[in-house]
């Protein structure tokens, strides 16, 4: 397999013709020209991501400080383990995205990857703010490192981490494609049992500030999911030779593995011990998401019978909406948080 070449940073011989631009294997000048983009969707993505700017510390966690010691034992354990999982995922994303960007030869897509990397930093900041606010430094450090001291967490992280490390050792297009699929799975599957747990706490009148932090993170992750879906679908058009029957089957198994791991994680960390959630709800919802992510790439559903959002989980979409206007005495600002409104004109 031919090794991918890392793009040069200074390239006077790069081709400025947007018609010849490619996602990988192109000859880029690295010039950020907002008026000449090959991929029209980048303009909308960029604007949406920039409009999503938020600051974790502007969300009031005073009620969470009171709620955290009163959580049921199962709720508190789940809160700690899920936070440990999420902070590790966003940390490894921050470290890995530049590795992908080094081989992306569409400069407008690299702009998107740079914004994503910044947002992953904000997410890590958010988790740190949550932990610093609600627990002691000793408890904080214990929670942070459960990602490697808890065998279930370590097993989960190994699946994605090994895939990322593989590209460190083997720089070819099929391996890069697998890394992109791993990103897609992480952004579109791996977070969702955890997100659902926080929304369920809020639904039960607990940890509302934490849930609001997660809403903004969830909103960002939706744009990251959109980004990697589009990168993969552009590669399907530009380099169909990467998507052989064997390759697609391998990607399919990656998606299925991601779904099954997320279900197993939900069983372990949530199970039937959290009021408002149970194993059946988790498994139905994650299989539905697996179908949604896989069919969005143009392939048949993985799990027949799970093509529609489960009725038992329809509330998740409402609680995940960061733009719902809801204010109360304890909140510093409306949850319809936006630094700017979307502009009508294009970039």
Please name every model-derived segment.
Residues 2-347:
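Non-heme di-metal
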